[in-house]
Structures are given as structure tokens and as C-alpha cells.
Regions:
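Soluble ligand-binding/transfer domains with enclosed cavities or grooves
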Residues: 3-176
Length: 176
């Protein structure tokens, strides 16, 4: 397990401290709403932020399982994602690190106190993606993502907690 190497002030005063804050392994719970007050799906899993080869780079690797809450109940759906976070002088740029869009920009954020706020919208076809991070404590944060378009009204709430030495999260394909 990768743990945070440097203890920094909270909230992180700058982007270098923010990179140190994110470094390590986290577990998450996620709730997904699509156009209604009732959640359509939940997900659980783990993600790691590890140092990349470029100064100011963290690589994000997420693994988890998704459960539909209505209609398509059954076995969990396993998923994974990779992103490339670049901590620059004034913003955090997030690039795709898997799939057909490797290296292309996904989101860009500004640090405002205990929040990372979008520096710009991310347009994917007719859909607009926006997310904001709230740094809740030294060892937890939330990320709320909105996806809006002609056929989408999606809200995704991710609650992340740092994994400690006593916590070894598991992501398995067995039903809960």
C-alpha cells in the first residue's frame, strides 16, 4: 500500500501541498442519480494516487464495483479508470489515461480554500461535465460531478476516505 509521505497543513495551502494530500490509497462510496431523487446505482472501491514520472504528476487508478438499484439488479459490474493529474502553478489539469482519449484533457480545477472548483466546463458531444472536490478532513474528501445534456441529468457523489494501515479494502466480484 502507498501511504502519504509528507504530512502537510490542512487545508493544503497550494497545489504542491494538495498533491501531497492526495498521494496514497483511498476507499470510496459512490451514489449515482439519473434525473430523479432516487439513486439509480451505487459503487464501492479503492483508488490510488501514485507519483508519476513528470514533476507535479499523480497517476490515479480506480477499481470498483457498481450495483444497479432498480431494474437490472444482479451481480455487481466491475470497473476501472485511470487519470493523469498534473499539478501546475495555478491549476490542476486532469487528463484521460486510458481508453481512446489517452493524453487528452478531461477537467481543470482551481484550488479555493478547502475546494477544488472547475476552471472550465468539459464538453463531450452535447453533454457538459463539471465536478468539484471538497476537502472535508485530512483523511476524507467528497467529489460531486454533474453531467448535463439533452438526454442526461446525472449527479454522482463520491465520498473518499484514506486507507490506513489497519484498513485493507477489498473489491470482489461476489454479490454482497
Amino acid at each position: 500500500m502507498v501511504t502519504r509521505a509528507v504530512t502537510t497543513a490542512f487545508p493544503p495551502p497550494d497545489l504542491a501541498a494538495l498533491a501531497a494530500y492526495f498521494l496514497g490509497q483511498w476507499q470510496f462510496d459512490r451514489t449515482i442519480w439519473e434525473g430523479s431523487e432516487m439513486p439509480q446505482a451505487t459503487a464501492v472501491g479503492i483508488f490510488d494516487f501514485i507519483s508519476g514520472e513528470v514533476p507535479g504528476q499523480l497517476l490515479y487508478r480506480e477499481r470498483g464495483q457498481l450495483r444497479m438499484l432498480a431494474g437490472a439488479l444482479g451481480r455487481p459490474i466491475l470497473f476501472s479508470r485511470l487519470f493523469d493529474y498534473r499539478f501546475g502553478a495555478d491549476r490542476v489539469a486532469v487528463l484521460f489515461a486510458d481508453g481512446e482519449r489517452v493524453g487528452q484533457p478531461y477537467q481543470s480545477y482551481l484550488l479555493c480554500g478547502k475546494m477544488l472548483v472547475p476552471a472550465a466546463d468539459h464538453l463531450c458531444g452535447p453533454d457538459c461535465y463539471n465536478a468539484a472536490y471538497t476537502l472535508d478532513t485530512e483523511d476524507s474528501f467528497t467529489m460531486e460531478t454533474f453531467i448535463n445534456g439533452p438526454k442526461k441529468r446525472t449527479r454522482v457523489l463520491t465520498v473518499a476516505r484514506r486507507c490506513g494501515p489497519e484498513v485493507e479494502p477489498e473489491v470482489s466480484a461476489s454479490p454482497a
